[in-house]
Curated annotation (Swiss-Prot):
GO terms for cellular component: extracellular region; hemoglobin complex. Heme b binds at H76, H111. Homodimer. Residues 1-16 form the signal peptide. It holds the Pfam family Globin. It comes from the Eukaryota. The gene is ctt-7A.1. This is Globin CTT-VIIA. Residues 18-161 form the Globin domain. The keyword Transferase does not apply. It comes from Chironomus thummi thummi.
């Protein structure tokens, strides 16, 4: 077991280039502007990528407009956005790397069991970035910070899938 922990930390070191303090602050400040828009974020992802919506049995085949005001949708959106918020809260501090790795590893394991592909994770990423960039003050620095942060997280995720 220790071998796997050491291997995982080596992977983190190889993949993740920690965000600078300025980058982490920029990701956190832009996320703070949208993090309470859980339903809108998930609705935007589902609208842009219906194949992602199809992976959720309770939402598959339904019009996004007809489900986005339901309690089930709000609950699920809260879980997804809550996970993103948890990861973002941990960035910018290298001592949090093991916690990030654990959370991302759990996400990978649960989604691998459901057959979720890297392509679908990349679609989610694109939908998330599209929503954030359309709803905050977005500039080259924000784009660079988000790209670096998401590259780190998705690198960990894909290594664990």
């Amino acid at each position: 077991m220790k071998f796997f922990a050491v291997l995982a930390l080596c992977i983190v070191g190889a993949i993740a280039s920690p965000l600078s303090a300025d980058q982490a602050a920029l990701v956190k400040s832009t996320w703070a502007q949208v993090r309470n828009s859980e339903v809108e974020i998930l609705a935007a992802v589902f609208t842009a990528y219906p194949d992602i919506q199809a992976r959720f049995p309770q939402f598959a085949g339904k019009d996004v407009a007809s489900i986005k005001d339901t309690g089930a949708f709000a609950t699920h959106a809260g879980r997804i956005v809550g996970f993103v918020s948890e990861i973002i809260a941990l960035i910018g501090n290298e001592s949090n790397a093991p916690a990030v790795q654990t959370l991302v590893g759990q996400l990978a394991a649960s989604h691998k069991a459901r057959g979720i592909s890297q392509a679908q994770f990349n679609e989610f990423r694109a939908g998330l970035v599209s929503y954030v960039s359309s709803n905050v003050a977005w500039n080259a620095a924000a784009e660079s910070a988000w790209t670096a942060g998401l590259d780190n997280i998705f690198g960990l995720l894909f290594a664990a899938l």
